[in-house]
Amino acid sequence: MTHASNTHPVTELTKELIARPSVTPLDEGCQTLMAERLAAIGFNIEPMVFEDTTNMWARRGNEGPVFCFAGHTDVVPAGDLSRWHTPPFEPTIIDGYLYGRGAADMKGSLAAMIVATERFVAKHPNHPGSIAFLITSDEEGPFINGTTRVIDTLEARNEKITWTLVGEPSSTLKLGDVVKNGRRGSLTANLTVKGIQGHVAYPHLADNPIHKAAPFLAELSQTHWDNGNEFFPPTSMQIANINGGTGASNVIPGTLEVMFNFRYSTEVTAEILIERVEALLTAHELDYDISWTFNGLPFLTGEGPLLDATRHAIRQITGYDTDPQTTGGTSDGRFIAPTGAKVLELGPVNATIHKVNECVKIDDLEQLALCYEVILEQLLC
């Protein structure tokens, strides 16, 4: 095992960002560091603070088209510190990998974006169009006061983004082997099935909501929602939480609470899913309350300049072709896509994200910056 320093500019900036313990929704000065670098190359910096969330909109240029790097400075908690090989907020290079919370998700991407932009502007100081950065500290948290609020602000003044590259860790086995050119929609239900609480010895004096709901839940879990399409897998429904009872063995509960989530394709809409679920509840003659939370619409970036530029960049820098996919969880791209912007995600290998000993290959950081730079050249030169 070797512990070594590294002078790659992307690695050094990534280390500076990791050293700031920006557990969501904290930013801990990450955006200030980024803003200083961007201001030095002609960006107008516009901080946008909403409640406990720090956001930044930075832009260089006043004309279209607008290419936007999007990302987040917040990270998930480190978890059990005893399971980390090195302190999570003390960036350490071991055997060619940089360890630390946020190394892959997504401070490495942020550093690559900054360095790529610095290089691009140095070569093309009078580039056409505009380059922008949309950065938040509320991606890993409730995503209430982050990207969605910045987009609301931009939309209110009719400031449009043409293309967005999100730095989420899209890669699976090696850098750039997968890019995300879309995401499924996400819809969450909070269901309360009502019964009558009572003693288990006197079931005729009570009404057990668990027994009543069981056939409904069985049918819900076995329902086929759609077949998906060439871009999206079939819609999936998963029960995430069930809670009922007092904890005592002799009490029939009065209510049953169930939370379930849909990850849905473009073959259905949230409205269709809601209608089908509520029809199923009615068919099972349940007494219920239900509330719905829209977490994001599905989006897809098909063939066009952004996907073409990204494919070209990955092929040029890595020597292999990328695979555009729409699988996985949601990202802040879901808040940007409804404005009409084309959205794509390209970032490091995601094998260690949200885990102890999160790490990124340092050679990948430099290659990622080169990919980002080529994408800028393809779209703005």
From Swiss-Prot:
Which residues constitute the catalytic centre?
Answer: 74, 139 (proton acceptor)
Q: Which species expresses this protein natively?
A: Shewanella sp. (strain ANA-3)
Q: Where, in this chain's numbering, is Zn(2+) 1 bound? A: 72, 105, 168
- The EC number(s) given in the record are 3.5.1.18
The answer to whether the entry has keyword Metal-binding is: yes
Protein function: Catalyzes the hydrolysis of N-succinyl-L,L-diaminopimelic acid (SDAP), forming succinate and LL-2,6-diaminopimelate (DAP), an intermediate involved in the bacterial biosynthesis of lysine and meso-diaminopimelic acid, an essential component of bacterial cell walls.
Positions that bind Zn(2+) 2? 105, 140, 354
What SUPFAM superfamilies does the record point to? Answer: Bacterial exopeptidase dimerisation domain (SSF55031), Zn-dependent exopeptidases (SSF53187)
CDD domains tied to this protein? M20_DapE_proteobac (cd03891)
Any one Gene Ontology MF annotation carried by this entry is: succinyl-diaminopimelate desuccinylase activity
Q: In which pathway does it act?
A: Amino-acid biosynthesis; L-lysine biosynthesis via DAP pathway; LL-2,6-diaminopimelate from (S)-tetrahydrodipicolinate (succinylase route): step 3/3
Does Lipid metabolism appear among the keywords?
no
Enumerate the UniProt keywords alphabetically: Amino-acid biosynthesis, Cobalt, Diaminopimelate biosynthesis, Hydrolase, Lysine biosynthesis, Metal-binding, Zinc
The family note in this entry says: Belongs to the peptidase M20A family. DapE subfamily.
**Description of how the protein assembles with itself and partners:** Homodimer.
Q: What catalytic activity does the UniProt entry give for this protein?
A: N-succinyl-(2S,6S)-2,6-diaminopimelate + H2O = (2S,6S)-2,6-diaminopimelate + succinate
Q: Under which main EC class is this enzyme filed?
A: hydrolase
What is the name attached to this protein's record? Succinyl-diaminopimelate desuccinylase
